[in-house]
């Protein structure tokens, strides 16, 4: 996949001490200068933001995130604090938020676990344990059930084959197994779907999807929709979409977070913050292709104030 990359790049002529002073000035005394905060943090990459946090602590003797939390509020605060949080820790905190308290944010669990690389997932698991003194797998088990639980536990192990190796015989076997597990029989053997979709490498799976279509005359997505349901179906579809095209998957997540009445701010914020440095330009291109309007125009119409301002900077421009 040729990628255009992210919208947030390392700022040239970067000076962490200077930025720290600008931020302190923006928050000192009465009122807060939100524009100054955006002008610094939205135009620095994650590594630079961490340097600013260190400089802030060493020159001012206060924690930057604590100060931002006490000065800001609502969705704008959530974006800024998200941007200030190291990448892996941000995912960890989002997973914890998705499972804490009453109710579960299944969409968040699926999105993170289906889209991150096996290596990222292993780092997420380790960091989760360090942060909360409990294992990610145990929390998933206590918060979910049935096949949905099994697919998340499987993804959270980070055991997917990371190679590119292709075995034609296994491709045919997997496609046949999936066909026999679903379309060909009454009832569905969900475990077979789980085994193939959670453990094989991307190159292998793309060939399996092609072979599956050849023998069943259907896209694997169509079969998943007719053979499974609920959160388990959502998880399997997310895996397939991420394997086919991760940026298109995130474009769809953003579209669904804003279309219709109301906004799913948690999803909108998480995707904008976590993809800004990785593939936001690709996400924008897919958004325009899929929905005929720019991501920029959607954000503009769906948000307001400083929250809108900072998201538009992360979006990086209109298409």
Curated annotation (Swiss-Prot):
Phosphothreonine, modified sites: 7
Stored Pfam families: Annexin
Keyword Membrane part of the UniProt annotation: yes
Repeat (Annexin) residue spans along the chain: 14-85, 86-157, 169-241, 245-316
SUPFAM superfamilies, alphabetized: Annexin
GO MF term list: calcium ion binding; calcium-dependent phospholipid binding; calcium-dependent protein binding; identical protein binding; NF-kappaB binding; phosphatidylserine binding; phospholipase inhibitor activity; transcription regulator inhibitor activity
Free-text comment about domains: A pair of annexin repeats may form one binding site for calcium and phospholipid.
Function: Calcium/phospholipid-binding protein which promotes membrane fusion and is involved in exocytosis.
Other information: Seems to bind one calcium ion with high affinity.
Name of this protein: Annexin A4
Species per Swiss-Prot/TrEMBL record: Homo sapiens
């Amino acid at each position: 996949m040729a990628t255009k990359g992210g919208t947030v790049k390392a700022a040239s002529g970067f000076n962490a001490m200077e930025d720290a002073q600008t931020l302190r000035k923006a928050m000192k005394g009465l009122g807060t200068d939100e524009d100054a905060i955006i002008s610094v943090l939205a135009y620095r990459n994650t590594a630079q933001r961490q340097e600013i946090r260190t400089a802030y602590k060493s020159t001012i003797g206060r924690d930057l995130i604590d100060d931002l939390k006490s000065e800001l509020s609502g969705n704008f605060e959530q974006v800024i604090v998200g941007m200030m949080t190291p990448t892996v820790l941000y995912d960890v905190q989002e997973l914890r938020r998705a499972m804490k308290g009453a109710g579960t944010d299944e969409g968040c669990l699926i999105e993170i676990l289906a889209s991150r690389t096996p290596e990222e997932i292993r780092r997420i698991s380790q960091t989760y344990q360090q942060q909360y003194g409990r294992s990610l797998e145990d929390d998933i088990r206590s918060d979910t059930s049935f096949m949905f639980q099994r697919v998340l536990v499987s993804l959270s192990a980070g055991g997917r084959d990371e190679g590119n190796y292709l075995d034609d015989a296994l491709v045919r076997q997997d496609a046949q197994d999936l066909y026999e597990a679903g379309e060909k029989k009454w009832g569905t053997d969900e475990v077979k779907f789980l085994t193939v979709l959670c453990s094989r490498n991307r190159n292998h799976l793309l060939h399996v999807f092609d072979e599956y279509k050849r023998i069943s005359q259907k896209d694997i997505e169509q079969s998943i929709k007719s053979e499974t349901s609920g959160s388990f179906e959502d998880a399997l579809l997310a895996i397939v979409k991420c394997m086919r095209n991760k940026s298109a998957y995130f474009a769809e997540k953003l579209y669904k977070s804003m279309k219709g009445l109301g906004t799913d701010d948690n999803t909108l914020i998480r995707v904008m913050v976590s993809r800004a440095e990785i593939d936001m330009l690709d996400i924008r291109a897919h958004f325009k292709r899929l929905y005929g309007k720019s991501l920029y125009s959607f954000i503009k119409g769906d948000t307001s104030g400083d929250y809108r301002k900072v998201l538009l900077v992360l979006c990086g421009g209109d298409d």
